Design a protein with these regions (language model features):
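Hydrophobic secretory-pathway targeting helix
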Residues: 1-28
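An internal, D/E-rich "acidic patch" concept
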Residues: 2, 64-121
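Alpha-helical transmembrane segments of integral membrane proteins
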Residues: 3-6, 102-135, 151, 179-324
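Hydrophobic alpha-helical transmembrane segments of membrane transport/permease proteins
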Residues: 20-73, 166-184
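Alpha-helical membrane-inserting segments
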Residues: 22, 26, 30, 119, ...
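Short hydrophobic, aromatic-rich alpha-helical segments embedded in or entering the lipid bilayer
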Residues: 50-81, 189-190, 269-280
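Membrane-interfacial helix-loop-helix junctions in multi-pass membrane proteins
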Residues: 59-67, 85-88, 94, 176-189, ...
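Membrane-water interface segments at transmembrane-helix boundaries in multipass membrane proteins
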Residues: 140-202
Length: 324
């Protein structure tokens, strides 16, 4: 069994690196066929005053006149050595700009994921504990409504209510000008966190509820009830233990979906993270920055799916047996 699981591990790791290479090639070629002139991103308004000779010289210096396959091979060699180039817009090393932004995305993303993981589990337990009762029906209806609201609409509603009408919370940014205290950063995190979590919370809670309700109808649960075992003991000691592996696998597979929602929330709230930086790079055709951001996002998504498959193979031996 151990050898079979190691075989699954080896195959998944090999598939991971192949997927990253294919992703880098696709993103590179797509970024090079956009209609936006990268010189506009690099020189700004000054490009309009440049002559054609100056533009050709600038393109030659940036390596934009070479065939796209040649550009890709050159970029790949530099990337493997840790050199991802200079950002056209920020005139800094790409990795330096990303390091300044990635901590904000990590804070927002990790907090959203933890709150979602715990909140959905507790909400699903509450619904299963009160199956078909008032609390269960109320949560189901409220959850159905919130899950139908797109994240950008949820973000706009939150901004309008809590920032425009009530003035309780800031509408954008990661901290106030001249601020930066822990309390100030937390106030700026509240609305993006709610927008990130609200759209996903009920989906996962509903999955937990349904799995738990189905589990409570199993034969061993019926037998336990016949022996006089308390419902709380059945739910928390027996049912939850059997549901957790499936729930962990579901949350691992959903990292990509949650990450995409976090990027969208960053763009709406003007939160200075990787999502906002990706939007700005795409808008200005900042090739080097866009390449690294898309590759970084792809690595996270592919890694999350790979880890989820490995977790499934570890928790479910039958899956490992099917891998040949």
């Amino acid at each position: 069994m151990k050898n079979k699981w190691l075989s699954v591990l080896f195959k998944r790791i090999a598939a991971f690196f192949i997927s990253i290479w294919v992703l880098s090639a696709i993103v590179f070629f797509l970024s090079r066929i956009t209609p936006i002139d990268p010189l506009q991103s690099y020189y700004g308004e000054r490009v309009e005053k440049m002559s054609e000779e100056q533009k050709d010289s600038a393109r030659e210096r940036l390596g934009l006149n070479d065939p796209i396959p040649v550009q890709y091979v050159r970029w790949l060699k530099l990337a493997l050595s840790g050199d991802f180039g200079i950002s056209y817009k920020y005139k800094q090393d790409v990795t330096i700009v990303i390091k300044e932004r990635i901590q904000n995305t990590l804070i927002l993303g990790v907090l959203s994921y933890v709150i979602l993981f715990i909140g959905a589990l507790l909400l699903g337990l509450l619904c299963a504990w009160n199956e078909n009762k008032f609390a269960d029906r109320l949560i189901v209806r409220l959850g159905t409504i919130t899950s139908c609201i797109p994240e950008f609409w949820m973000a706009l509603i939150l901004i309008f209510v809590f920032s425009v009408l009530l003035g309780w919370l800031p509408a954008s940014g990661a901290y106030s000008i001249g601020g930066g205290s822990l309390l100030d950063r937390l106030r700026h995190l509240v609305l993006p966190l709610i927008a990130s979590v609200a759209g996903h919370l009920w989906y996962f809670a509903y999955m937990v509820r349904n799995i738990l309700c189905e589990e409570t109808r199993s034969e061993y649960i019926v037998l336990a009830r016949a022996k006089g075992t308390k419902d709380s003991t059945i739910l928390f000691r027996h049912c939850l233990k059997n549901v957790l592996p499936a729930y962990i696998s579901l949350m691992a597979v959903s990292v990509a979906h949650i990450l995409g929602g976090t990027y969208l929330v960053e763009a709406v709230f003007g939160y200075p993270g990787i999502g906002m930086l990706t939007y700005e790079s795409a808008k200005t055709s900042d090739y080097n920055m866009l390449m690294v951001l898309c590759l970084l996002t792809g690595v996270v998504m592919i890694a999350a799916n790979t880890i989820a498959e490995l977790v499934n193979a570890r928790l479910n031996p039958y899956m490992a047996q099917e891998e040949k």
